[in-house]
Swiss-Prot record:
Domain of life: Bacteria
Keywords: Ribonucleoprotein, Ribosomal protein, RNA-binding, rRNA-binding
Summary of the function given for this chain in its UniProt record: One of the primary rRNA binding proteins. Required for association of the 30S and 50S subunits to form the 70S ribosome, for tRNA binding and peptide bond formation. It has been suggested to have peptidyltransferase activity; this is somewhat controversial. Makes several contacts with the 16S rRNA in the 70S ribosome.
GO biological process: cytoplasmic translation
Region of interest: Disordered: 224-275
One GO MF term attached to the UniProt entry: rRNA binding
Protein name: Large ribosomal subunit protein uL2
SUPFAM superfamilies: Nucleic acid-binding proteins, Translation proteins SH3-like domain
Listed Gene3D superfamilies: 2.30.30.30, Nucleic acid-binding proteins, Ribosomal protein L2, domain 3
Self-association state and partner proteins as the record states: Part of the 50S ribosomal subunit. Forms a bridge to the 30S subunit in the 70S ribosome.
Similarity remark: Belongs to the universal ribosomal protein uL2 family.
Length: 275
């Protein structure tokens, strides 16, 4: 999927690029697989902001995605490749031979008319989902489960891919896009191939308004605030932050500070930390 550049007819279009959406084959989503999606503006039930920089944006409906791929042994035909406003990857509409319809994350190279299936005996080809114990070492995979039957949680965004490195005992060793090598149960399922829409990383937003369409509000730097609003605030004119290291608005160290809990239970599954 290439990206389209614009002539610099305005400051907003000078560096803006957009996807050409060449892989998209259907504009209207499948109604039976939609759910309402209410905007919160980053507020909780008390009306207080719990997530900053959220608000506004175009109205969306949630697409119900099959991350579990638990319809084993039943073949499905790819009916369409669709856009999903809730994620960077595209989604594929599957029509199963028994009449059921489901969405999955569309892997790179999947086309309308292709046949996909899940289960132990599925072929090793993009879009098929198998337990890790049935996938050959060296295979590129995505949509990986952390617990058997829970549904894929890892490697789901556009262009991402992991690799099955080894199998040892009851666990598979997987190299994730971050460079981390992690052990996952061989009973967990994964989907073959790389997530589609691989040119997503080349899209340049170009202007602030486009971020507002996405529901993302401006991020104000702490150093330009008043002392009452941020630990970096205050001072006459341009001032340094006045601390050994930057902190969040609540005084916690940030920008390079390690936030992972020490002695976390899942540490024993991580063979090599991310880069």
């Amino acid at each position: 999927m290439p990206v389209k550049k614009y002539n610099p007819t305005s400051p907003g279009t000078r560096f803006m690029t957009v996807s050409t959406f060449e892989e998209i084959t259907k504009k209207e989503p499948e109604k039976s697989l939609l759910a309402p999606l209410k905007k919160t503006g980053g507020r909780n039930s008390y009306g207080r902001i719990t997530v900053r920089h959220h608000g506004g944006g175009a109205k969306r409906k949630y697409r119900i995605i099959d991350f579990k791929r638990d319809k084993d042994g039943i073949k499905a035909k790819v009916a369409a490749i669709e856009y999903d406003p809730n994620r960077t990857a595209y989604i594929a509409l599957l029509h199963y031979v028994d009449g059921e319809k489901r969405y999955i994350i569309a892997p790179h190279g999947l086309k309308v008319g292709d046949i996909v299936e899940s289960g132990e005996n599925a072929d090793i080809k993009p879009g098929n989902a198998l337990p890790l114990e049935n996938i050959p070492v060296g295979t590129e995979i995505h949509n990986i489960e952390l617990k058997p039957g829970k549904g894929g949680q890892l490697v789901r965004s556009a262009g991402n891919v992991a690799q099955l490195m080894a199998k040892e005992g009851n666990y598979a060793q997987i190299r994730l896009p971050s460079g981390e090598v992690r052990m996952v149960s061989l009973k967990c399922k994964a989907t073959i191939g790389q997530v589609g829409n691989i040119d997503h990383e080349n899209v340049s937003i170009g202007k602030a308004g486009r971020k507002r369409w996405m529901g993302i509000r401006p991020t104000v730097r702490g150093v330009v605030m008043n002392p009452v609003d941020h630990p970096h605030g205050g001072g006459e004119g341009k001032s340094p932050i006045g601390r050994p290291s930057p902190v969040t608005p609540w005084g916690k160290p940030t920008l390079g500070y390690k936030t992972r809990k020490k002695n976390k239970a899942s540490d024993k599954f991580i063979i090599k930390r991310r880069k």
